[in-house]
Amino acid sequence: MRYTSAAIESLIEEFAKLPGIGRKTAQRLAMHILHQHTDEVEKFASALIDVKQKVIHCRVCQNVTDIGADPCAICCAKGRDRSVICVVETPSDVLAFEKTGQYRGLYHVLHGVISPLDGIGPDDIGVKELLSRLSPDDGPRVSELIMALNPTVEGETTVLYISKLLKPLGVQVTKIARGIPVGAELEFVDEATLSRALEGRSAL
């Protein structure tokens, strides 16, 4: 059953394009928006536009940051161990590790994994940017790279590719420990499990 309002149907269709949102949920969201005050809806619309216009990738770690805050707050933070880089798939994974309060190194966000079936190769993710960080002109040398990608076939493929690429550079490459279910996404793993996986990492 479709609404008689084309505007409502259009909004439902847009909400339904979001991951994990079916038509019923999209309908509820559209009805919620319809009954909100105009100023609240305008704030919501403004926030959506700001995300596209003001958010960029940090030029160092490729994590998300705002225009005018590049490098990002983590890359600029004092007290971080700059000899260790944790390689993750998405910005959400950075948040997951930060919530543990255990990791004090830096990060590198790939924004994807190697997936030949989807036409995604090494040049389509942040591998080139990662390599450029391992031979800095100044500052401390990176001694360890922690591979913390989701335990999927594509994630494992990416881990193997990067570890082989870095072997000649003399950088120790480690991988977070098992204990995270195969196919799970790191952003949904609880802090205690993630901390244990980080502490129990092993060399590749």
Curated annotation (Swiss-Prot):
Family label: Belongs to the RecR family.
GO biological process, one term: DNA recombination
Function: May play a role in DNA repair. It seems to be involved in an RecBC-independent recombinational process of DNA repair. It may act with RecF and RecO.
Protein name listed in UniProt: Recombination protein RecR
Molecular function GO terms recorded: DNA binding; zinc ion binding
Gene3D superfamilies: 3.40.1360.10, 6.10.250.240, RecR Domain 1
Organism domain of life: Bacteria
One Pfam family this sequence matches: RecR_C
